């Protein structure tokens, strides 16, 4: 029993002792791991205590060299890395440990011991190191180099990252290079002087002289080649001449090739000419001299032509109006008109007429008829002042050709005055037909000789005369007289009575043509005879109805006034007391009226087309 208890106590004590040992070992390992994590240099020092694979390789290399030295003493082969005594560390720690384990497995313990002993003996046999002044130049000592030596030797600068992990082995001592700073001092002291610069210039000149003959040789070769090609061309030409003599003047190349070459040459020439012309035109445009004289000449010619046309047209129209009016001119105007009638047209005016007809594309006969009829081509406006015939064409004032509102609307009259809506102006009548003839057809010829009770003073009379349009092709004596048909309304209707007289005469002429039943066959050549009152009433009613249709429902005052006019002046009752046996217009006069109305409709159509053309432009 006692032995068993003692055995148990001993086992317990051993267990307790083992537990303490295990806990202490774990604590020590824990502390060591913490220290290694905090201080990695300590880990590197502990790792470097083991023999590195580089050291092993170096020792093996030394041993091989010694063996070769014993074998070949006559021709020793020195290697710059024979004096390596410091191990090279080029890889990381993981690779080092891996290589160490592999080298351990490869070498046995006896080999290890032999290598280590030989290395120790070699270290003991080496002489003591020389002082620092006589120390050989080592590449791994970066402090020995000045900062500018790599630039002086033009060596490759190693990056800082590689220099930290790489160490170069020591070299053998060289007798020629005892002082490592000797060469660098020479380079630093050496500077460029004027003499050195002069020598450099002379060297460059010599180099240029050396390169010169080669260029001359090349030029000579090129010239020889050109001469050779020229000789070949000459031979080819002589062969062609000989062949032409034999064949009969034909070239070697066929006709198709000749044609192709000719066409190609022509195309090239044309392209070159066009390009040259374009360049010249561009240069002229840039300089601002292209086309300016031509355009100015064209504009001047057009302006001169328009001025001449306006002068000739106004001159001839005045001449025709003066001849057709038949009025007696007294004073200087009468003498001038007589001279114009006696004097024929000169060659210059005829030439101008031909030029106008050619530019306007109007036959000369039509142009003369238009001038006689009083029409105005190109919308020329006649002035309102009294006619004064000029002796020469240069005395005629210029026409207003630059008016943009010439074809502004179809309501513009020939005299340049706007037509009121619903009012027709008396325009160019056919030859031999005047307003007086129309009034004679209506039986109102006695109104011409009456005097106007309006216009109390001369100013108002002149003002009213300025408002009246001038009808070309007839004199002012043949125009509609400014008289009052209704004396009891002169105070209210004086401002526009003159226009109403003209409108009424024109409208009655139109109604006469539109309703031919108003004029019986026996009334075309009327003799004063009593007319029944029933016929008068019927004619008055028809005229009133036609006037109402023309004026419309809005103008009641004008309808009342025209009703009074129709009552006061019946169609068949007005007679001329002085000439009771006067004959009136016949069928020819009626045909002239119809021709005038057709002409007016055609002119309205032309104005409408001109307006449409101007709007489209």
Swiss-Prot record:
Residues 261-286, 295-307 have a biased composition (Basic and acidic residues). Residues 261-307 are annotated as: Disordered. Residues 1-30 form the signal peptide. Pfam families: Granin (PF01271). Binds calcium with a low-affinity. Belongs to the chromogranin/secretogranin protein family. Interacts with Secretogranin III/SCG3. Neuroendocrine protein of the granin family that regulates the biogenesis of secretory granules. This is Secretogranin-2. It comes from Mus musculus (Mouse). The gene is Scg2.
